[in-house]
Amino acid sequence: MSTVHVVAPVAVHSVPPAQLLPQTATPPAYAQTLGGEAASTLAQKKKSPPLSANKRKRSETADDSTDQESNTPSRKSRDGPKKKKANRACFHCQKAHLTCDDSRPCQRCIKRGIANNCTEGHRKKAKYLLDDEELEELKRKQNTVPSRKSEPRTEKPKPSEPPAQTAQAPAAPLPRPSLQAQAQPVPISAPAPIPASTSEPFAPNDPMFNLTFDSNFPFGSEAANLEYTILSAILGNPSPPDTTSPPPQPYPWPSDTLSFNSPQLDSFSSFPENVLPVISADNLLSSTGSLNYLQARTAKQQSTADPADLQCGDDASKYTRDGRCSSPPSFYMDKESAARTLLSPPPTDSPGSATSTVPLNEVAPFPRPGSHLQSITDRVKAPYDYTEGYHFLMKHLTTRFEKNDILRVVRALAIFRPSLIALQMPLSWDDEVFVERCFQRSLLELDKLISYSGTPTVVWRRTGEICLVAPEFCMLTEWSMEELMGQKKYIYELFENQSVVEYWENFAEHAFENTTQSVYSHCVLLKPSGAPVPATFCFSIRRDLFDLPSAVIGQWLPLL
């Protein structure tokens, strides 16, 4: 049977009937039909507050705020007043992305000791904040930069040129120098007079500032072409006149007018492939003008000129329309002597010339490196025979050394000779020719290095044959350069017997070692008279492309 709970009556005089039970309350009849457990569960649900969407958050009381402050850590208080944000930072603080202030100089710059340089920083304005005038100025700047890059260079004729030459001179081909830059060693008309009171070194209308840019020079960049044009103009024009002296008088040209077929223009318009135009500065600066220069160059080149050139007269004033030579005069030099023309100006017989009087046949050799390389290729047609050097060594040992010394040298040769033979076996004829050309090429570089050093130096092959000798070595040993270089001379012929044995033993030990290391030893050199010259000795071994010892560089210092 179900248990029936009797509920005591409650006075409800002051409570309205609607508020007596909630809307979700269970009817009493239904509660009576439930069991005990279900009734207790229902009572607990009635005690819990109903969920509503408009539930408000409980306002914090003073006790709650004190609890939260006690739980959170207290912040560190600032020392002094809070820094005010600056309207605009100075240049240094802006660059370093540091905080600045409104004072100038700012405190940070004062601490860093750069208060004198504390200035307002530059702030770039956004495009949408720019005014119409500022936008137009910005567009104008952007348009001027590419227009300057794409603007072609316009050629202007030099003020000193005659109208006939500018109009009738043909355009020079690509490998030919500029006619306007080099065809005028002396201006035809007198330059504009410069006032004596001016302080500028050059006049504003000086032709040097109005050079014609010629793109026909065979260089890869415009800067190199312009530089070559300026250098050509410097060599082709006299120096600026003195401000205190009157301007020089113009030099007269031949009486007839220059035409397209005149010899003066023909000499500049015909450029063979194997010659280079060279203009001497001393002749151009001489007081006799450009005609003396033509006379000097013609007299200089008579020995090497073509037969057709020799038929022409030496005097440049004879070049008229009636008496014109079919070929230009000998005005240029070949490639080998082009480099030394500026160093040794051509001689002339004119009394007013300022050039040096060097005999025609006494010209210091100053060939170009390209001619040396070409001569090496033309000269070296077969590989070098090293067996001849070893045969001479064996003959020299038997005539000069004792048996024990000969055995020591032979043992040293037996150490590295098998390695040389093994490395030479796979080489072909062309490989050996290439090795010899490389050796001759390396001698050019070594000759240059020896000229920079004041130490007695000799370069020889692995067989001992001398290839290069420094003048200091000749001074040390009293051997002449002709005796050492003119005929086959071996380095061990200049050594004392003990030094020869020690050299070959050291060479056998270091022939295939590191080439960056040098061998230091004591050596006794012999003069032509047989007098000994004790010295300290060091040598290093250079190997070729196939790892064969090719060149030996030795240096000596005398023991005083």
UniProtKB/Swiss-Prot annotation:
The keyword Zinc applies. GO terms for molecular function: DNA-binding transcription factor activity, RNA polymerase II-specific; RNA polymerase II transcription regulatory region sequence-specific DNA binding; zinc ion binding. GO terms for biological process: cellular response to starvation; gluconeogenesis. It is found in: Nucleus. Residues 163-187 have a biased composition (Low complexity). Residues 90-118 bind DNA. Gene3D superfamilies: Zn(2)-C6 fungal-type DNA-binding domain (4.10.240.10). Residues 148-159, 315-324 have a biased composition (Basic and acidic residues). Residues 442-515 form the PAS domain. SMART domains: GAL4. Transmembrane segments: none annotated. Transcription factor which regulates nonfermentable carbon utilization. Activator of gluconeogenetic genes. This is Transcription activator of gluconeogenesis ERT1. It comes from Schizophyllum commune (strain H4-8 / FGSC 9210) (Split gill fungus). The gene is ERT1.
